[in-house]
Swiss-Prot record:
Keyword Glycosyltransferase: no
Record protein name field: Nucleolar protein 6
Higher taxonomy: Eukaryota, Metazoa, Ecdysozoa, Arthropoda, Hexapoda
Compositional bias of kind Basic and acidic residues: 28-37, 1146-1169
UniProt KW keywords: Chromosome, Nucleus, RNA-binding
Family affiliation: Belongs to the NRAP family.
Pfam family, one: Nrap_D6
Chain segments carrying region Disordered: 1-51, 1146-1199
Gene Ontology cellular-component annotations: condensed nuclear chromosome; CURI complex; small-subunit processome; UTP-C complex
Keyword RNA-binding: yes
GO biological process, one term: ribosomal small subunit biogenesis
Known function: Part of the small subunit (SSU) processome, first precursor of the small eukaryotic ribosomal subunit. During the assembly of the SSU processome in the nucleolus, many ribosome biogenesis factors, an RNA chaperone and ribosomal proteins associate with the nascent pre-rRNA and work in concert to generate RNA folding, modifications, rearrangements and cleavage as well as targeted degradation of pre-ribosomal RNA by the RNA exosome.
Gene symbol of the encoding locus: Mat89Ba
Quaternary organization: Part of the small subunit (SSU) processome, composed of more than 70 proteins and the RNA chaperone small nucleolar RNA (snoRNA) U3.
Length: 1199
């Protein structure tokens, strides 16, 4: 037993030592980092083993039982495990679900430790600043050269500066030892003496004015001091609060100026005012201060938020003192708080006026310690886990308290009634969560609950999901509402904000808007919305010489929808007979949208209808948008043009092209011109279902059809091209724009031949017989092709393939030199197995996923369209890889709520491409949890140990069997270069989206900005003949090379796929010399990038290296680009129109030359072009119609 423990102990320690060596090497290699690797703490806060356990162990090793049989004693040379080894082993087993997770946490904590140079600088700076404050002198503040960082309604006069009587001190993370990079912010507090304040300064913002003046005076003296001559001075608002200006000082020292910033707060002692002056139910801003009249008989409205704003300063010193006592010398608490801060920052829940700051988490750790939920010896992991667990399971809306003096339940309830969230500080006077809205607090709880669930999932490495992945709040919401029009903001505040909110927030517009809009939307959307979250960005700092900016005239809200109710087309009100007052209120709230309606159950009630049940999914996803805009217009008099509601803007890219007219289609289906690929998929699926029933019902087949599976993307709602019923039979040929593949399997029989070609011939005979039966019994047209049986049904073309296990076995069969038959996987067998056996299962699983998450299919459509418009076809980036990566997003719990908006799903897909570690991460989709935990662990272990045997992008499903990780992608598709290219494209796209989303002035990104490739970086562009390449049926956002012109929607012969086939030939023959890019969705240009010049250098003549080479003398050969271009033309044959460089095409655009892309393009004439073709186009030549008339009259004369 001890021997096993000892071995396990070694296994635990060895990776730690290796990880420590690696981390130290990285620390030496990256000296510019603002973080350093400190030696791990010997006291990690875990419980030491009890002495009784140690005694038992020593007894069992010291007095072994005698055995009468002579045995070899293996324990003589084995040292007993140390207490530390036993402790680490027990901790790994009991606390962490894997040794890897523990090592990752430990390594991250070591990397987060502050470098000594920063610690020394902070101590020295604080000492020098203390000396500086001692040198300050009392006096009247005269005219300042700096602007006061506060918008004052009255100009201050006669401010007398009093020298601080208390030395400046560190607050926040710098005091608790939990500073976090990459930008280290050191908070320093300077306390105004009590003499600077008068007893009436609690009223009408006087305290805030004096605080700002005090800060201005200290800043001006600092700028005059030689000690700070090289430093940069800026003012900023703490937490976007215009009443909380702070000084941001960037030191001029080169060693730290890039990564460190000092922030100076001005505070005041708690004894400056009478106790109870700032309790939440008191009023400290009189209506007369803003020129308002108030009835003296009415009680003054409470100013609980303003009171909390002042109490933040007054209680800061005492709160910090207690936090310092709790964290000082406790590395486990400090490291636990660091883990929580990383988690919070990655989710951007700590930004802005309503942010859930890290100081709340530090106070909560102390609270849990005082409640004996956390122990002093708890490890950092236990601290973080306990905080998450308690956050998820405690309710702060009823109030919790850290007060040293016990607070009565009635008083705590009275406190809690004034705020959405209540957490009383050590003084018992200040609510630490005064500015946090209810929805944001609930969001924090949900994220904490998710973190605990991820930790409990033994099948998952939860470390990157919790700590490494960036989860900006805008990527967690489904819809976004932006209001930035200054006049509209003022109008809303003036007409609709209640006076008590104006006094409560000291006329600051942002929280008033947040309160007004949240209440309105909460009432109007009700069960349709899960959360309404403020999306804030930090206010930028400004030079101390400039005036303070006006903030709060802009608001942005994120809506997380409730999938069960968000898309309901009806708002049903109360019945007028039963509840006349309720019905009247309903009509007043909804206005003209409300109508009296009679329902099938006989009830007659007020109701609002937002659409019909037959509307497309895209239209239903905009119902919430319709409701919000109506409420803003009806209740707040906001016109829709003054509001930006972001929902479904990118859906345009998979809509049907407006150039294609559906009314010309001969079909019984009722199709709308404004339809899209998502709405058209059910029509194709219903046609497939009917075909499947007809196949099952065929009579007199030699073998019964036992399985039918649709494997085309349309059957799982993943086809970005609108699939229209336009296939038709013309001169015994089926013309169509797309083919839907179907795989069938027949019943068992032992009469199938054992030779591959004979078996395939028999399969063809079976398919022909099925076609004849379909024609005879179901009146369907059919044709045979090289790939299978083509069947025309209801305007759709289906390709039926026959799968048989023996064909797969014969493909794998090989005979050795000794005549032994072996079965070995090869490219052909893997392709057949994927197409006929694995893809049907995966396709069914993805279809089921779409039924569970309605946004899955449309997210795939956006992802596929984006990749295609970046000139990445299936040969460079497999379509199935895109589908599986999106499915991975929906399967993994990255967020507390599933994705409801395709636009949000697309943003998360871009984040996945931009920030994933493709070299170290295997994307596994365990459909229906069909793989056991051990199978998943074995695959991941094999992936890590044999990484070089897997493709650059490794995607696996639970149906892949022995091919897991190697089936859906390959070394060339996508290659390492293409993967890097896609990563850069995704990061650039995210930058564009984030800039447009978070900017106050910009509107949301237009689809053309994302879904059109750049025309930079290509060497050549080959244009195809436009009449031979049909346009995409989806909305065309244009080519990066050539302007728009008349589109071409001609149908091609079923199964031709000429462009894709030719590009595949070019890649197979010339991929060593050039890379080929084109848009598979109707692209009419082929962009070429040459390989590096070394591939075209002259080299010695070798028989094995003569591909595409030409002799260049002296027994050497060389690949010549001009020769390759001629080869490209030869392979393209009739498709080739002309070849040009991107620069030439740009010049044509600038010179307004006629675009050479579509029907009006004239083919570039070669020297060998015969002249009669030119004469044929001559308008002066006699028309052929005249010739026919002459010929016709001659024929009549012969009669």
């Amino acid at each position: 037993m001890l021997r096993n423990k000892r071995k396990a102990g070694k296994l635990v320690r060895a990776p730690q030592k290796a990880a420590r060596i690696d981390s130290q090497a990285n620390a030496h290699a990256e000296d510019h980092s603002d973080l350093e690797h400190s030696a791990p703490s010997t006291d990690d806060g875990f419980d030491e083993p009890k002495p009784t356990i140690a005694k038992k162990v020593s007894l069992s090793t010291a007095i072994p039982k005698k055995n009468k049989f002579k045995q070899r004693d293996d324990t003589k040379n084995v040292k007993p495990p140390t207490l530390e080894e036993m402790k680490e082993l027990r901790d790994t087993q009991n606390l962490f679900h894997s040794n890897l997770f523990k090592l990752q946490v430990k390594e991250m904590l070591e990397e987060l430790q502050l470098k000594q140079k920063y610690t020394d600088f902070i101590e020295n700076w604080l000492e020098s600043f203390t000396v500086f404050t001692r040198q300050l002198k009392d006096g009247l503040m005269e005219r300042s050269h700096l602007e006061i960082p506060l918008k004052l309604s009255q100009k201050p006069t006669g401010f007398v500066f009093s020298k601080p009587t208390r030395e400046p001190y560190l607050i926040g993370a710098a005091a608790t030892g939990t500073l976090l990079g990459p930008k280290i912010v050191v908070d320093v507090a300077l306390e105004m003496p009590k003499e600077s304040l008068h007893k009436e300064d609690y009223l009408n913002l006087r305290y805030d004015q004096k605080r700002a003046l005090y800060l201005t005076y200290v800043t001006e003296r600092m700028k005059e001091s030689p000690a700070y001559a090289q430093d940069q001075f800026n003012f900023n608002y703490y937490a976007n609060n215009p009443l909380k200006p702070v000084l941001e000082l960037t030191p001029g020292t080169k060693q730290v100026n890039k990564h460190l910033q000092v922030r100076l707060f001005i505070t005041a002692p708690l004894s400056s005012f009478k106790p109870g002056r700032f309790v939440p139910w008191n009023n400290n801003i009189r209506p007369s201060y803003y020129g308002d009249e108030w009835d003296e008989k009415e009680p003054l409205p409470s100013t609980q938020h303003y009171n909390a704003n002042v109490l933040f300063d007054l209680t800061l010193s005492e709160n910090q003192t207690h936090l310092d006592k709790a964290f000082k010398g406790r590395r486990n608490f400090q490291d636990g708080l660091l883990l929580l801060k990383v988690w919070l920052r990655q989710r951007q829940l700590d930004i802005g006026y309503s942010g859930f700051g890290a100081h709340i988490l530090s106070a909560f750790i102390v609270y849990l310690n005082t409640q004996r939920i956390l122990h002093h010896s708890s490890s950092s992991y236990q601290v973080a886990r306990t905080v998450w667990n308690q956050l998820a399971n405690t309710d702060w809306t009823k109030g919790i308290s850290l007060s040293l003096v016990p607070i009565q339940t009635e008083e705590l309830n009275k406190f809690a009634e004034q705020y959405d969230v209540c957490f009383i500080d050590f003084t018992g006077q200040h609510n630490l969560c005064a500015n946090i809205p209810l929805y944001l607090y609930q969001r924090v709880r949900e994220e904490a609950k998710l973190a605990v669930e991820l930790l409990n999932d033994m099948k998952l490495n939860s470390f990157p999901l919790i700590f490494m992945q960036k989860c900006p709040l805008y990527s967690r919401v489904d819809n976004i509402l932006k209001i930035s029009n200054y006049s509209c903001i003022n109008q809303m505040l003036t007409l609709h904000s209640q006076p008590r909110f104006k006094y409560d927030f000291a006329k600051y517009g942002y929280p008033q808007l947040l309160q007004l809009l949240t209440e309105l939307l909460k009432k109007g959307l009700a069960e349709r919305v899960h959360s309404i979250l403020p999306l804030e960005t930090a206010t930028p700092a400004w030079p101390v010489e400039n005036k303070a900016p006006v903030i709060g005239n802009y608001i942005q809200l994120g809506l997380i929808l409730q999938p069960e109710h968000a898309y309901e087309v009806l708002n049903k009100g109360p019945a007028a007979n039963d509840d006349p007052e309720g019905a009247e209120e309903f009509r007043r709230f909804w206005g003209e949208k409300s109508n009296l309606r009679r329902f099938q159950d006989g009830s007659i009630t007020e109701a609002v209808v937002w659409g019909s049940a037959q509307d497309s999914p895209a239209k239903k996803r905009l119902i919430v948008r319709q409701i919000v805009l109506h409420l803003l217009e009806h209740q707040l008099q906001l016109d829709s043009k003054d509001v930006q509601y972001i929902a479904g803007e990118l859906d345009q890219v998979y809509k049907l092209s407006p150039w294609f007219k559906v009314n010309k289609l001969k079909t019984k289906l009722s199709l709308d011109q404004d339809t899209d690929a998502e709405a058209l998929s059910p029509h194709a699926i219903r046609s497939y279902d009917e075909l499947a029933r007809q196949l099952h019902g065929l009579n007199d087949l030699p073998l019964e059809i036992v399985s039918i599976s649709g494997v085309s993307p349309v059957f799982r709602y993943c086809e970005p091209q609108p699939v229209l019923p336009q296939a038709r039979l013309v001169e015994n040929r089926i013309l169509t724009s797309s083919i839907q593949r179907v795989v069938i399997q027949l019943g068992q029989s032992g009469k199938w031949p054992n030779e591959l070609s004979a078996l395939r011939a028999l399969k063809t005979a079976f398919l022909i017989e099925i076609g004849e039966k379909l024609e005879a019994q179901c009146h369907l047209h059919w044709m045979m092709s090289a790939d299978g049986l083509l069947v025309l049904k209801q305007g759709y073309c289906f390709l039926i393939e026959l799968a048989h296990n023996k064909e797969l076995a014969l493909l794998k069969q090989e005979v050795t030199e000794r005549g032994i038959t072996t079965y070995i996987d090869n490219a052909a067998s893997r392709s057949l197995e994927r197409q006929h056996y694995i893809l049907p299962k995966v396709s069914g699983a993805l279809h089921s996923l779409h039924q569970t998450y309605s946004a899955f299919g449309s997210t795939v459509l956006l992802a596929k369209r984006w990749l295609a418009t970046q000139l990445l076809d299936d040969g460079l980036w497999p379509d199935m890889a895109t589908e599986l990566l999106v499915a991975h997003l929906f399967q993994q719990r990255y967020a507390p709520q599933p994705i409801e908006a395709p636009q949000t799903g697309f943003i998360r897909f871009l984040q996945l491409l931009a920030f994933s570690d493709f070299n170290g991460e295997l994307f596994l989709l365990n459909f229906n949890n069909s793989w056991q935990e051990q199978q998943v662990a074995d695959l991941e272990h094999n992936y890590r140990s044999n990484r070089q045997s897997y493709p650059p992008l490794a995607v696996a499903t639970s149906y892949d069997m022995q091919h897991a990780g190697r089936l859906w992608t390959s070394e060339e598709s996508p290659s390492q270069r293409v993967l890097g290219h896609v990563t850069r494209l995704a990061r650039h796209a995210l930058e564009i989206i984030e800039t447009s989303l978070l900017s106050k002035d910009l509107r949301f990104v237009r689809p053309a900005q994302l879904f059109r490739a750049s025309n930079e970086g290509y060497d050549l562009v080959i244009q195809f003949k436009p009449d031979l390449v049909p346009n995409s049926l989806s909305y065309d956002l244009g080519s990066p090379f050539v302007s728009f012109s008349q589109p071409n929607f001609n149908l091609t012969r079923a199964g031709s796929g000429d462009v894709a086939r030719i590009v595949g030939l070019l890649r197979s023959a010339y991929s060593d010399f050039a890379a080929f890019f084109y848009n598979p969705h109707g692209g009419k240009e082929l962009a070429i990038v040459w390989r590096p010049p070394t591939e075209f250098a002259a080299k010695p003549f070798k028989v094995t290296e003569l591909q595409a080479c030409s002799p260049c003398g002296n027994g050497r050969v060389q690949v010549i680009k001009e020769t390759l271009v001629e080869d490209f033309k030869l392979l393209l044959k009739d498709f080739y129109l002309r070849i040009a460089t991107p620069e030439e095409l740009k010049r044509e655009q600038r010179e307004h030359q006629k675009p050479k892309r579509y029907f009006d393009a004239k083919q570039t004439e070669e020297k060998s072009t015969p002249k009669p073709k030119v004469r044929k186009a001559n308008e002066k030549e006699a028309p052929p119609k005249k010739k026919r008339l002459i010929k016709s009259s001659a024929l009549k004369a012969l009669k």
